[in-house]
Amino acid sequence: MNNLRTVSDTKRAFYSIHTRPVNSVYRRVVEELMVEMHLLRVNEDFRYDPIFALGVTTSFDRFMDGYQPENDKDAIFSAICKAQEADPVQMKKDGQRLTELAQSKSAQEMLDWITQAANSGGDELQWQLRNIAQNPKFKYSRLFAIGLFTLLELSEGNITQDEESLAEFLPNICTVLNISESKLQKDLEIYRGNLDKIAQVRQAMDDILEAQKKRREADQAKKEGSDDTPTTEASTPDSEPTSEVSS
């Protein structure tokens, strides 16, 4: 009997954990991330690692930026993880560890750290990277690519803003970790394009909300101005005698 969880199982679990409605504009983001994580976790070659965790947390934070109510974001992330029996606390903790590491290094130092990890291990994080580099069945994913990109983005100098420097670093990282450069480049191109698209959508939404706010303020000012205007009766002095004279 096959007890493998299905996408429908994961979605049902999510909506049973997070019972508040998800803002319709962001529902697709939530469900796509949830499905992507699900398909990876049911793959027999998938192994959880901190770079994947950083990719998940970064993807969620970037694409859910601006979500309202803001207080629901943590609950939604937690429900996404718990729906597929992942630990949201560990996911955030691992992502934060790599974030702090990247922020303390330059891009070259980050590459050197990854290279050392792949060749000889080191601390706990480096041994996990060594396992990735030496695993011929390593299950590469878009979320792993986003995690790698984020390491370079957070490092001193942020070379991701320099296309020439980025083009030099990415092939080296792919070689060190034994992952496909073409897949990584394609996934990052889509990721960056989607970030641009969602930024445009958010700007359009902000413009609409601002226009609605100004219209409400104008309507309110017009109403208040109308309320303050004296009526004709109130402004007319006592009535003069009629022109009709009794004979």
Curated annotation (Swiss-Prot):
Residues 198-224 form a coiled coil. It holds the Pfam family ThylakoidFormat. Keywords: Coiled coil. It comes from the Bacteria. GO terms for cellular component: plasma membrane-derived thylakoid photosystem II. InterPro entries: Thf1 (IPR017499). One of its GO terms (biological process) is photosystem II assembly. Residues 228-247 have a biased composition (Polar residues). Residues 210-226 have a biased composition (Basic and acidic residues). Residues 209-247 are annotated as: Disordered. HAMAP family: Thf1. May be involved in photosynthetic membrane biogenesis. Belongs to the THF1 family. This is Protein Thf1. It comes from Acaryochloris marina (strain MBIC 11017). The gene is thf1.
